[in-house]
């Protein structure tokens, strides 16, 4: 790890740091009650991955080079933001918000920023608000299709219960939509899904 004694999770195959790795690591940490690990990963992610201004404000760069200490791409992968918000809501409920990090405040910052993203700078909400499904990426054409592995109906239920941002019913609708979508997107015999899919569940080619 580099920077303020914080840590990151490195992607071994591609030799980079990705939001899916750090946000998944935070989920494991909060589930195992490893507050110090959680806090260190979050602080690192906030410093090096999170955009602090502009159209991408509060979103995260999905890939980071730990050698050059620069972002490989400023763009976001929607599952990273999905996990970060859920991680922080879990942490808020487990440890409170008076122990050094206001977890709830950090979660709300991301959520509130999502709802302000209307396509300015080609950046959108991570959830396609028309289809009530998570997008592949909240940018450009990537907003118009999805990755089945990103669909986490239980996470949407958590947002509806604990985010308290006024969008509770929308999140519950997203949870219901995700459950229906996964039945469509997964092969009935193998229960496997394609890497990418259209919102009605058929494969999307890239």
Predicted features by range, described:
Residues 15-19, 54-57, 75-79, 101-206:
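Extended ligand-binding clefts on enzyme/binding-domain cores
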Residues 3-8:
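Short, small-residue-biased leader/transition segments that mark boundaries at the very start
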Residues 40-47, 72, 89-90, 105-115:
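Active-site-adjacent structural elements in enzyme catalytic domains
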Residues 67-74, 88-97, 135-140:
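Short acidic, glycine/Ser/Thr-rich loop/turn "cap" segments at secondary-structure junctions
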Residues 35-76:
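Helix-terminus loop motifs that line ligand-binding clefts
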Residues 21-37, 44-47, 82-98, 151-167:
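Well-ordered alpha-helical scaffold segments within catalytic/enzyme domains
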Residues 9-10, 134:
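Generic recognition of long tandem-repeat/solenoid scaffolds
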Residues 11-15, 26-31, 71-74, 96-99, ...:
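Second-shell loop/turn segments in exported
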